[in-house]
């Protein structure tokens, strides 16, 4: 028995653990889990070693019924109790990796997709870090049953206008109990909208954290009688929810993006990484903004990125370079939203950026104007293109991008495209209230 497993068993015994949740995500990033009754604490050693068989054909995006057997193996580094369920101290959780019965990694496991990309560049000495900024809405219902924001607060408001203060405090405390390093929490721009940021970390740990973060929020809000949504654009005329992703590369403990001897203090690698993100932005959008609703957020006028450009401290461009330098030097990609699968999104972002470094893709000069104030003809003269304006455009861009397809791998790419084609066709044929209001009197 390893020391790590020994410490886990001791902690489980201390907490009186009676059930172990084995958790993973489907192709959408939606958490799934199995609960195992624990007869004795050292039983977990066998579970970690041998895993547990499950039916993968019942999970969207995994396997067909004729090859349904898959194996869940807990990652010991993800052990935690669930602080938002204090009445059930006897429950712990592991995030799992998925394997075929012969011991080979299952290529349709989103967590494996990210681990594969990270391992590829770890061999070259690179460590990829991500710091996400997920936004979300807390919702209520009016007397007619309509979904409404739970408050009328705006950016950085305080109580009583901001009615989410106590909720955010509770959530931050629970996240810290899960070893999150929370940096800040606040009310966002739209009524009922909030943001909690946690410090950047290694990409795999961060992706695990995003899944846990969303799960914790939904559990806590449900207990106080409200709803929470990570839907990108739940209300017309209001800002949508994004998940801006701050990214950096480290090598031998040093930030690869930092060069104190250049005018901007950005290294060549940083600029090439930006160049890769810009080049592959249309295909990246399919993975990082993966729903039909995502594209109702990505429109001018609501602080969401639309134009494929980068700037220093410029929040109107797709990519922003925050002012921090040294170990804090980073690139902020502003198009992702919290409906994305973080494992797939981080893998795709890493491959896009590294493709830029490997091929020395020059991003050009930074854009320091407010691009929202320019016409399309002016932007085209400047060489600035737009992101896809619909899921249909985005998945067609993905079809043409071998780098992002390669990041996903053949299995995930094919399943992802099947699902997105169905999603678009289902959306395309529906008749909405707007159409009845606009065209019924024809």
UniProtKB/Swiss-Prot annotation:
Domain GS beta-grasp per the UniProt entry, residue ranges: 15-103
SMART domains: Gln-synt_C
Single GO MF descriptor: ATP binding
Cell compartments where the protein resides: Cytoplasm
Pfam families referenced in this protein's UniProt entry, alphabetically: Gln-synt_C (PF00120), Gln-synt_N (PF03951)
The GS catalytic domain, residue ranges: 110-442
UniProt keyword list: ATP-binding, Cytoplasm, Ligase, Magnesium, Metal-binding, Nucleotide-binding
Key word Cell cycle present: no
UniProt cofactor(s): Mg(2+)
Annotated positions binding ATP: 183, 246-248, 315, 320, 327
InterPro entries named among the record's database cross-references: Gln_synt_N, Gln_synt_N_sf, Gln_synth/guanido_kin_cat_dom, Gln_synth_cat_dom, Gln_synth_gly_rich_site, Gln_synth_I, Gln_synth_N_conserv_site
Name of the molecule in the record: Glutamine synthetase
